[in-house]
Amino acid sequence: MTYPLISHPEANDGERTYPDEQLTDDGSLRLTAHNTVVSEYATRLFRGPETQRRFLCVAASLHDFGKATPQFQAYVRDEYEGPEKEKNHARLGALATWFVLDQRDAPARDKLAATLAVARHHQALPDAAQYTAESLADAFETSNSVLTAQLEAISERWPQKATELLQRSGETDSTWDEFRTWVQSGTVVGELHEVSARRELTGPKATSDKLPRKLYDRTLHYWAAITLADKSHAMAVPESHVFDVETLDRETLEEYISGLRAEPPDDELERALNDERERARRQAIDGVHEWLGGDAQTPPIATLTLPTGLGKTFTGLSAAFEARGILESDGGPTRPIVYALPYTSIIEQTRSIFERPELWGADPTKSALTVHHYLSETVVYRNERESEDVASTDQEEHASFLGEAWRDGTVLTTFVQLFESLVGPSNRQGLKLSALDDGLVILDEPQALPKEWWDGITRLIELLTTEYQTRVIAMTATQPTLLRDVETTSLLDVGREHDKTGCLRCEVGPDYPVRLEPARKETYFENAERVRYRIDESALSFHLSADERYLSHETAAARVVAATAAGEGGSTLAICNTINSSATLTQELCGHDGVTHLGEAIDSVLGANDVDATKQENNVSAIVDAILRRSGLRGVDGELSVPAGTDIVVATLNSRYRPFDRRLLIEIADTLSGSEIPFVLISTQAIEAGVDLSFKRVFRDIAPLDSIVQAGGRCNRSYEWGRNGGQVVVWTLADPDEENPGDPTKSPPAHWVYERGSSDAGIQTHLQLISSILAQFEDEEVPDAEISHHAVNEYFDALREKSLSSTKIRTLIDDAKAGKLARESLIGGYQTVDVLVATTQAERKRLNELTELFTSDDPTDRSTGYKKLEQAAGIRVSLPLNSIEQLPDVSRVDGKERNEDGVQVFRYTGTESLEYDLQTGGLRGKEDTVAGRFTTF
């Protein structure tokens, strides 16, 4: 019997739909059709040079060539009873790829990259040298029984069909018999060893030294395109959903900004600030014309360096929109804009900008905007989402697939999602990489990346800009060492020199009613005198000539109270280096008379209204209003006032709070920080980047200079308290258990973060370096630009001399060791696990339903459980792994034992040996562990 060769059997659920010409009579997907479509898709996804597209076309058209074996054809029809390995198909496809590309005289890099991409199109990429010299070479030996059985079976059953598949790429006229003769000659083994091994007396020895240069870059590129093309067609995702992406537009942003500028400013300072923001935005747009207007095939990285508070988000987006307009002027497909931020904890506020009804009113579950971080529901519904509680399996799977593959016009994500997908990605992580092909990436505050990764990040940026032709815009409030060894173009510098005369893009751009002359980049810093810095004596304790004198949390709390109370008034932000330090400062602050913490009011409102924080439709603003009224801060007339018996209102923010509660806290802080309410927010450094809040004064525990400047960016952000009306105090807090801060015996929290390496790899004498720079300022108050510009530059120059970055990532990339790269992570330090925190009856019911789904014997229930687990992101909190290990009564959400496979997510409903308290710092063990002591954020 001769089967029609198929790639996938008929779908049992009837959900997958293909054109009739791609199907057999029984509804199965034809192998020829699948290989053809995957080849077409992959070459459309790939935006590289035409020569490389032809090589990729060969690989993609042969990716499932191995499915032509009778063994696989029996297996796919549930009729196979032979040896397990003989039904595998990827390596035979890889062998055919090498054969055809060798005939086409493809360079060694392309030939090996395409072969590896096909061999691993269902898996993650391997360490290339070892896999090529050993796994592939052994599999292709003429004595290999699996290969022999597959070759013989095809020759006996349907050699003509194999010939048809082989020639489908259009790059060979060889027949099956010619291919088989070549395989049986054994020459391929020597060819593989030639590019992956050195010859020794004992035989070939795998070595990365023999690999073609930049093999990892090209392999990743081919593999990602084939993987996405293969999966999208296998899942029957509509072609238009893969390629025709919708996006947010610049025109709407221009109209929004025009409307803001039409509103009369409150005073001259606000008018001047608005003009500075708009001047910088227009200047950056002009800079894009210079950046992309040259002949360079690989444009340098564009930098946008502006003081905090000068509108980098809108300026960066405007520049990216303009760049996309230039690149798409030839009528090509829409390029995604990927906007990457440092932390999950701050991404929601940036997301809210895109969701503003008066701006784009974007819905991240629909097309145009995708939000992707580990707590988000990452989906793209191209059509209306079904109204039932659970949409069809097909619709849900497509939406999830499109979301994780970033098949959308605008993507808001984290550095972790972006860079870890380039470093030994899993098969699923690799789906998103084609969105970077000839695309645009905005890096918002890249200096927040771990310093030991900086060398690796520059190598990854090189991969993006040279292999993927990605245009990168790096936005910073400082200019870090990270970018000093790569070619960059300052959008503000070249925008200032841009000649608009004869510029076609300027001619078709918006016609602004008021002309704003461009300015020197330094002028923006000089004009942005929002704060004065004061260096506390304790911040100089690490200087060589200074005595160690730290500040107790008790003394720090007293100073915060004195600064915030009625005499001074206004709002205060106190940033600590660890969660334990922030909890201790909160406790000391609340010990003062007249201090009221908002945690109780938040708890009360959530409980009284039985709020389910897993629901997307929750109205955060309405809940915040109820909290303010419950606490007596907002009266029946809607006005804010201080209730009787209260002198200061306090809130605490860190990563141990649920994401939903963090959203509440940020909106509360946004409401109170600019009011006349004496308000204190105690936070960890999670608030420093991307959180658009403004306080009258900021206290910052000693930190790297760029972190101090980021803290200053939360102070007098829009001149609410006049020019230079904000104050930033830098001090050193003692260990919470230190008995004598004036003569300390314990290391301060800053030591554990910046020298022992809770956030970075640990930098010896780091605090000494920081203190020595701060010690140069003898005046009681230091001007803004002296710290934000000059001191920061000096700091990064000093760091550069220390050679902080590890070369490990770069070396592994250059050696094409994808398997080892997969074990590297941007999130250093301790291991964590996630806990779903239920505080209301509705949430406890939701957790119980989730556990019932995971413990069900019905696979459909478990599938539903995974979807509902994603939807529970709003109540998901990370804890150090060893904290959970010491709390045996905390159970897993899937009901399994801790050492079993399954869903490694835990549950808290209020009865376990955990506690969740909005007043004392969020989720922690009732007897907190040592691990929680030095946790940052």
Swiss-Prot record:
GO molecular function annotations of the record: ATP binding; helicase activity; metal ion binding; nuclease activity
Top EC group: hydrolase
Cofactor names: Mg(2+)
Record-annotated HD Cas3-type domain positions: 24-232
BP term (GO), one: defense response to virus
EC number: 3.1.-.-, 3.6.4.-
Loss of function: phenotype: Loss of the 8 Cas genes in this locus (cas1, cas2, cas3, cas4, cas5, cas6, cas7 and cas8b) leads to loss of CRISPR interference against plasmid targeted by this CRISPR locus, i.e. plasmid is not destroyed by CRISPR. Disruption of this single gene also leads to loss of CRISPR interference.
Pfam family, any one: Cas3_HD
Superkingdom, taxonomy of origin: Archaea
InterPro entries xrefs: Cas3-like_dom, CRISPR-assoc_Cas3_HD, CRISPR-assoc_Cas3_HD_sf, P-loop_NTPase
Protein name: CRISPR-associated nuclease/helicase Cas3
Gene: cas3
